[in-house]
Amino acid sequence: MGFSDNLNHMEKRKSGYVTQKQFSEFKDANNQRLIKIETTLATQGEQLNQLIKVVILQGEQIKELQVEQKAQGEQIKAKGEQIKAQSEQIKTQGETLKLILQALGGINKRLDKVDPPK
């Protein structure tokens, strides 16, 4: 066995020389880290897809609510117009009743003049 067998095949690295075994362990550790990162990214990707689906669903629900609110707004506006028309009608009826009362008052005065109380 030679000198290089004894050192387990040396590799030149930035930090100095390392054995093939150390280099393999380093590569394995890095590969495990990469696998963890890939797994985490895949999980986060799935979570993101689920969140996107939820957001899309909520967007559709919001659109439906907006349509519903618009319809309710139109109904409220129509009811307001009805109330306004009824108010005008009541006001007109009130004026008519005033005129009727005035006429009745005039009739009453004339009746009092024609038939004095006994």
Swiss-Prot record:
Pfam families: DUF16 (PF01519). It comes from the Bacteria. Transmembrane segments: none annotated. Coiled coil: none annotated. This is UPF0134 protein MPN_287. InterPro entries: DUF16. Belongs to the UPF0134 family. Gene3D superfamilies: 6.10.250.40. It comes from Mycoplasma pneumoniae (strain ATCC 29342 / M129 / Subtype 1) (Mycoplasmoides pneumoniae).
